[in-house]
């Protein structure tokens, strides 16, 4: 299936000069949505994860059904102040600013093998920050999985050397 035909492009969002790739148009298409989950499940399974980590918020949309399909637990990585227990926190740079992410300190344990899921990788800042959080939990990063990769922004270069899965790439 060619997911590119389902992904909407929105110029100058969230600020001028950014071309936003909108995955929500895939979510509303039953075949596109099913293909995304089924294909990512197929590609993630050989990495032998013990948990799926989803990055707020579109990583939740993908990560929860992937964890379910794989028979694994799902761990959310959230923006500050959204998790009720003790957290690890990291600041990171975005394509269009900076932010912080948090994970519960007890969300992962030594021996856990984690695949991080999000809808899109651009500069790699969010994914790299999430890798730092996984390390702070003493878990092992097994890989990353994205639906969309913006290759021209070289996000892969900021990530640890683990498998990186993407279903659609743009230059």
Curated annotation (Swiss-Prot):
CDD domains: PRTases_typeI. One of its GO terms (molecular function) is AMP binding. Pathway: Purine metabolism; AMP biosynthesis via salvage pathway; AMP from adenine: step 1/1. Its main location: cytoplasm. Gene3D superfamilies: 3.40.50.2020. The keyword Transferase applies. Belongs to the purine/pyrimidine phosphoribosyltransferase family. Catalyzes a salvage reaction resulting in the formation of AMP, that is energically less costly than de novo synthesis. Homodimer. This is Adenine phosphoribosyltransferase. It comes from Synechococcus sp. (strain ATCC 27144 / PCC 6301 / SAUG 1402/1). The gene is apt.
């Amino acid at each position: 299936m060619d997911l590119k035909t389902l992904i909407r492009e929105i110029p100058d969002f969230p600020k001028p000069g950014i071309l936003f790739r909108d995955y929500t148009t895939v979510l509303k298409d039953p075949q596109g949505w099913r293909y995304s989950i089924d294909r990512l499940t197929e590609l993630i399974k050989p990495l032998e994860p013990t948990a799926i980590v989803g990055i707020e918020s579109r990583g939740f949309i993908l990560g929860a059904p992937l964890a379910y399909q794989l028979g694994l637990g799902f761990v959310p990585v959230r923006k500050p102040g959204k998790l009720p227990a003790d957290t690890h926190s990291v600041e990171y740079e975005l394509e269009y600013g900076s932010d912080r992410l948090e994970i519960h300190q007890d969300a992962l344990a030594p021996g856990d093998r984690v695949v991080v899921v999000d809808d899109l990788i651009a500069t790699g800042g969010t994914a790299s920050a999430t890798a730092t959080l996984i390390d702070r939990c003493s878990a092992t990063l097994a890989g990353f999985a994205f639906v969309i990769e913006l290759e021209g922004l070289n996000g892969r270069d900021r990530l640890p050397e683990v498998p990186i899965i993407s279903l659609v790439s743009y230059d």
